[in-house]
Amino acid sequence: MLGIIFEVSRSDAHVTFHWGLNWIRQVLPASLYEEFGHDRELWSLIQKILRSEVLLTDGTEQSRERPQDQKTQKDWYSGKKKQHTLKTQILATSDGLEIVDAIAGVPGPTADINLFREQQPRLHPEQECMGDKAYIGAERMTTPHKKLKKKELTEEQREENKVISGKRIFIEHLMCRLKVFRILSHQFRLNSRRYRTVMLAICGLFRFKLGRIDFTIYDC
């Protein structure tokens, strides 16, 4: 498509696309942690600031091409989606307007709670978070009440679930904004090894669009 629009060869379009993608990754940090995590003193300050709110977390899966060998097929097959998928998990502020941390390109069957436990050490030890039922059992995590077998939720539990849902809507909006990019709205057709780069580049563009990154500091 780039070749048709700009009248360049397929190989030139390929090189230009991947050059631009890598450039975006270099200048637009995908998350607060990627931007400031290397500075222990500054990140410690940011942790204390984030501690004043409840962070939101959510995961999303995107279909990918079917791997050729059977072992790889099994590793990437999501029973939930009934297809081979790539998973991304986002940790965001309570208003859904800043990405605190992002993990992208892991196999779809990877449990959301395991990804959160991987991210948790980067947060303040007392940081409170909120997620859906996939995160039940995680420390310092508020989740909806899960209906037990042959037992209905109480009225109080249903009301609490509504409150949690109302607060989690902001990270759902964030996910929708990321999926505005068409490359995330259907099967990922590039080499799956490029998915992490693509996803994190889009996270960087999202942060830049909302003014979270001072682009003027880069010498471009």
Feature locations, PLM:
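Short, well-ordered secondary-structure "scaffold" segments embedded in the functional core
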Residues: M1-R25, A30-C220
